């Protein structure tokens, strides 16, 4: 759980922004969204595998683009 200490004479908006940023870094909102509905283990594995395939394709695409640009 992210904890921030509100500094003296610090506006509420600034403290709230710091808290939101710390929550984002901790991944709390992403975790809440992921756990909002039950996901069957097979669906979770399928989604993770699809993400891995997408990452690999993106990596290969970047490498091929780099090779094309270098003459």
Curated annotation (Swiss-Prot):
Coiled-coil segments on the chain, per record: none
**Superkingdom of origin:** Bacteria
Cellular component aspect of the GO annotation:
ribonucleoprotein complex; ribosome
One of its GO biological process terms is:
translation
Q: Which residues cross the membrane?
A: none
Note the Pfam families from the entry: Ribosomal_S21
Q: What PROSITE patterns does the database record attribute to this sequence?
A: RIBOSOMAL_S21
Keywords from the UniProt entry: Ribonucleoprotein, Ribosomal protein
Q: Does the keyword Nucleotide-binding apply?
A: no
Q: Which GO terms describe its molecular function?
A: structural constituent of ribosome
Q: Which PANTHER family match?
A: MITOCHONDRIAL 28S RIBOSOMAL PROTEIN S21, SMALL RIBOSOMAL SUBUNIT PROTEIN BS21
Family affiliation: Belongs to the bacterial ribosomal protein bS21 family.
UniProt name for this protein: Small ribosomal subunit protein bS21
Q: Which organism is it from?
A: Shewanella baltica (strain OS155 / ATCC BAA-1091)
């Amino acid at each position: 759980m992210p904890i921030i200490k509100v500094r003296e004479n610090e506006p509420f908006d600034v403290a709230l922004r710091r808290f939101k940023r710390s929550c984002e870094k901790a991944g709390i909102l992403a975790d809440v969204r992921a756990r909002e509905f039950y996901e069957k283990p097979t669906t979770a594995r399928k989604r993770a595998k699809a993400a891995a395939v997408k990452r690999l394709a993106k990596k290969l695409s970047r490498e091929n683009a780099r090779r094309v640009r270098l003459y």
